Curated annotation (Swiss-Prot):
Mn(2+) 2 binds at residues 41, 79, 114, 195. It comes from Hamiltonella defensa subsp. Acyrthosiphon pisum (strain 5AT). Gene3D superfamilies: 3.60.21.10. The lineage of its organism: Bacteria, Pseudomonadati, Pseudomonadota, Gammaproteobacteria, Enterobacterales. Its EC number is 3.6.1.54. It is a peripheral membrane protein. GO terms for biological process: lipid A biosynthetic process. Belongs to the LpxH family. It catalyses: UDP-2-N,3-O-bis[(3R)-3-hydroxytetradecanoyl]-alpha-D-glucosamine + H2O = 2-N,3-O-bis[(3R)-3-hydroxytetradecanoyl]-alpha-D-glucosaminyl 1-phosphate + UMP + 2 H(+). Keywords: Cell inner membrane, Cell membrane, Hydrolase, Lipid A biosynthesis, Lipid biosynthesis, Lipid metabolism, Manganese, Membrane, Metal-binding. This is UDP-2,3-diacylglucosamine hydrolase. GO terms for cellular component: cytoplasm; extrinsic component of plasma membrane.
Amino acid sequence: MSTLFIGDIHLSVEYPEITKNFFRFLQTEATQAESLYILGDLFDKWIGDDDPHPFYREVAAELFALKKKGIPCYFIHGNRDFLIGQAFADESGMILLPECKVIQLYDYNICILHGDTLCTKDTEYQIFRKIAHHRFIQRLFLCLPLSFRFYIAKKLRLQSGEQNKKKGEEIMDVDPQSVLDLMACHDVDWIIHGHTHRPAIHNIEMIVTPLLSSKKIARRAVLSAWHNEGSMIKVTFDAIELIFFPFRVSDFEKI
């Protein structure tokens, strides 16, 4: 028995090999799991559920096929696909979750999220995020013609790329204190997230009883982005593992 977590797949028409390998994952590894959690940035961009491009219908069909096999797929929005709505969720069979969710899984108490909210030192991004997640702004954006939405999204991605080149590594990574605060707030022993593209499992020393100097070791598991290989976090009764798997091309000639 296992539960799988993935994120930062960044599906796009421009990167067909990533799509092919994602479909392979859904048809193989994912079918052996009890459930699948996608922790944001499933797509490289998302300008609305009403985008009629066949690419999105194909992805939705593959995800829905997993549901038909009796395997639930849960989704937390990322910074690139936070506009995914209930319409696409219904089409794909995904179950939308809030941006931060605590789950009891086997013997673990885990907080799952995309991870961008932990990068609190990146104040420019956090300001943008607050604006972009405002319901009025989102409704206004979704009222625009698709072509104009596509133009805005492309321009924002270019601007973000240029800004990120000027930011230090520390600013773009999670803030350690924000991690501690989140774990203490939800009383969890594990955090699983993506966003930073810095895969690892970190040990975190937490003070349980300040007066007695009582401490415990918590852990933070970070997913990798899907570029030249895929990654997942596999949770079983025995362990929580970060697993990488190489992309394969020859298997997908018929996909």
